Design a protein with these regions (language model features):
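N-terminal low-complexity, acidic/Ser/Thr/Gly/Pro-rich segments
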Residues: 1-198
Length: 198
């Protein structure tokens, strides 16, 4: 047998890293089918917070917070949610060209007696969405974009505009990324945009 080699090339400044990626197809009880490239990364890092107006004696943005970072990303996904998915007569929502990034940041060393703070951010896009399976009803959408941020229990938010978070969304063989860049000054955000035709 011919010996083979594998190169280990992770940078030490990444700290301990757990990383997985690949092409995946999921069928959840016939209701949800998703197929495409997915990536998961777990590592230690730091984030900058936005300053809270309610705490005039403290500027939360001056010190970075060390966190455990869990990121999940996907690219080029197709998805269907509804009934009879994969059959000749499906009814539900069909999505194409889905890309998404999720970052969950958990404080690594909370203040004594305090619970670790946790912040979540989501960014997603899709090139198209169609509602199919109901005669006479045509719903199509394109250029869909979604952004969500969630604050910690103490009302702080990660300021992604001060320190962007790049999330791997593709496989190592076919790399792609998505950047989280929302400013903490916007507060918690839930927003979506796109072109809709009914």
């Amino acid at each position: 047998a011919t010996p083979s080699t594998m190169t280990l090339d992770l940078a030490a400044n990444l700290g301990e890293v757990t990383r997985a990626s690949g092409n995946l197809t999921i069928d959840a009880f016939g209701f949800l089918q998703v197929s495409g490239a997915l990536a998961l990364n777990k590592s230690t890092g730091s984030v900058k917070l936005g300053d809270l107006a309610s705490t005039t004696e403290v500027n939360e943005s001056t010190n970075a917070v060390t966190v455990e970072q869990l990121t999940i990303g996907g690219s080029g996904l197709t998805a269907f949610a509804g009934i009879n998915g994969g059959s000749s007569a499906p009814t539900g929502l069909s999505l194409e060209g889905v890309n998404f990034a999720v970052a969950i940041q958990t404080e690594k060393t909370p203040a004594q007696g305090q619970t670790a703070r946790e912040w979540t951010a989501v960014k997603a896009s899709a090139t198209g969405a169609n509602f199919i399976g109901v005669d006479g009803l045509v719903v199509t959408s394109s250029a869909i974009n979604v952004e969500i941020t969630r604050k910690a229990a103490d009302n702080t938010l990660v300021d992604y505009s001060a320190q962007n978070q790049v999330v791997q969304t593709g496989t190592l063989a076919s790399p792609s990324t998505m950047t989280l860049d929302l400013a903490a000054g916007l507060g918690e955000v839930t927003r979506a945009s796109g072109n809709l035709t009914i």
